A protein has these predicted regions:
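Partner-binding and oligomerization surfaces adjacent to conserved cores of proteins
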Residues: 1-244
Length: 244
C-alpha cells in the first residue's frame, strides 16, 4: 500500500469508516486509476492514483477537520491607501487599532508571504500517523498563515480561534482612525459613543500633499462633543415635563 494510501486509510478510520469500508474505498480508487481497470497490469495507475486521485480526497478530510476554526485578520499599519480603498469603502470607513500585547494569545502570528501554498504529504503523515506536534504546527502554519507575495503590502497578522462566527474581541481598542472621506455624522456618532472610554484615541486621515501617502491628525473628542451632533432632548431629559 502506498504511503498516501495508508494516510487516506488512517483518516477514513478516524472519520468513522470501518476497516472494510476503508479498504473498499482504497480498492475503488485503484480501480478508477487505470484506463483498463486493471491496477496490477497498468503501470500508469499508481502514478495517477498518487498524483490525481488521492490528494483531493486527503485534502477534503483535512480541510473538514480544520476549517471550523475562526480567523481574525489584522494589519500592522493604518497607512496603506490600497487597504483603505479595498476594505474601508474607498476611504469612507474606519480603521480600528487594537493592543494585542496586553493579553497573551498563542495563536496570533504574522502571515508568511514566502511560504509555499501546498501542505507536504510527509507532514500530514507525520502529524496524523506519528503524532508529531512539529508536523502539525507546520500544517497549520501553511493552511492559516501562507499567502501569496502579492499581498505583502497588507502586513497581515491572523489570530486563530477554535470556532467560527462573530465573537467579542480579546484585544482592547486603543484608537479609531476615520477615513479621509468618512462622513462627519459618522465621526461624530462614533466619537460620542466611545468618548467615555478615555483610553481610546481618535484620528482623522488626510492625504499628504504631492504624494500618495496618508497622515493622521488627532481628533479632540471634547470639541466633537461641543460642536458635533447633540443628543436629542428626549435622551437627555427622559420623561421630564418642560414648562410651557
Amino acid at each position: 500500500m502506498l504511503s498516501l494510501e495508508r494516510l487516506y486509510y488512517f483518516l477514513l478510520l478516524k472519520t468513522g469508516f470501518s476497516e472494510q469500508q476503508a479498504q473498499d474505498e482504497i480498492f475503488y480508487l485503484r480501480y478508477n486509476s487505470t484506463a483498463y481497470r486493471d491496477y496490477q497490469e497498468d503501470v500508469s495507475g499508481e502514478k495517477y492514483l498518487k498524483e490525481a486521485l488521492l490528494p483531493p480526497k486527503i485534502n477534503e478530510l483535512i480541510v473538514a477537520e480544520i476549517q471550523g476554526k475562526g480567523v481574525f485578520s489584522l494589519s500592522e499599519t493604518w497607512k496603506s491607501p490600497l487597504m483603505w480603498s479595498h476594505y474601508a469603502d474607498e476611504h469612507r470607513g474606519i480603521c480600528i487599532e487594537y493592543n494585542t500585547a496586553l493579553i497573551p494569545h498563542p495563536n496570533i502570528a504574522a502571515v508568511d508571504y514566502r511560504s509555499p501554498r501546498s501542505i507536504k504529504a510527509s507532514d500530514l503523515i507525520a502529524w496524523k500517523m506519528k503524532a508529531s506536534s512539529e508536523a502539525e504546527r507546520r500544517v497549520y502554519n501553511t493552511y492559516f498563515f501562507a499567502k501569496s507575495p502579492e499581498w505583502r503590502y497588507e502586513k497581515e497578522w491572523r489570530d486563530i480561534s477554535q470556532s467560527i462566527g462573530v465573537t467579542n474581541s480579546h484585544f482592547p481598542v486603543t484608537a479609531i482612525y476615520f477615513g479621509l472621506r468618512c462622513a462627519s455624522a459618522v465621526i461624530t456618532s462614533i466619537v460620542k459613543l466611545f468618548n467615555y472610554e478615555r483610553d481610546i484615541s481618535f484620528f482623522k486621515i488626510y492625504p499628504v500633499d504631492d504624494s500618495f501617502s496618508l497622515k493622521a491628525y488627532p481628533i479632540n473628542p471634547d470639541e466633537v462633543e461641543v460642536c458635533g451632533i447633540r443628543l436629542p432632548g428626549s435622551m437627555i431629559f427622559g420623561d421630564a415635563v418642560l414648562p410651557q
